[in-house]
Amino acid sequence: TLQESIDAIKSETESMKDLVEQLLFLARGDNETMQLHKQDFDACDVVEEIVGEMEMIDPSHNFETDLNRDAYISADKQLFKQAVRILVDNSIKYTPQGEQIMVKVAKEENSVSIIVQDNGIGIAPEELANIFERFYRSDESRARKTGGSGLGLSIARWIVERHGGYFEVLSRLDIGTRIIIIMPTK
């Protein structure tokens, strides 16, 4: 029908807009023209905000949080929020409806960890090394028609590394994935 065609065009236009925004973000990062506006904040506040938004947008998943308060970092709050949101968005994409997505904040002596864990499809061991590469999408994710450009995790990596942080990833096929952002404390 005409309405279905219009809806498909709208959806594709939105996808193209998102792709252009992601490419511009990475281009600014490559050219080192993006400024970080660091401030001190509790990572728990950002996680609570993201999970609250996701619970409204996506009632089909069960979101759980485990927040270790006073987990202060010095970072660009908007960029940090974007990185965490990318991980939560991926968990939503690859976790069956009705399943749980856990987001934790843990404090160590010199770091704060943000852990996003799901019961999703998991990532094959041979593909783990590539998940942060630009445009990379695993065979499983390409087969699922979940959409996406393969740029989200490369953007998250750029943000985290620019703040002196790094990632740890643990994943098993058909069991789920745990991605941890480890940020230095302020």
Please provide the spans of the model-predicted regions.
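A conserved beta-strand-to-alpha-helix junction within the catalytic ATP-binding
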Residues: 37-52
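Conserved catalytic submotifs in the C-terminal HATPase_c
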Residues: 37-40, 60-72
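Conserved glycine-rich
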Residues: 164-165
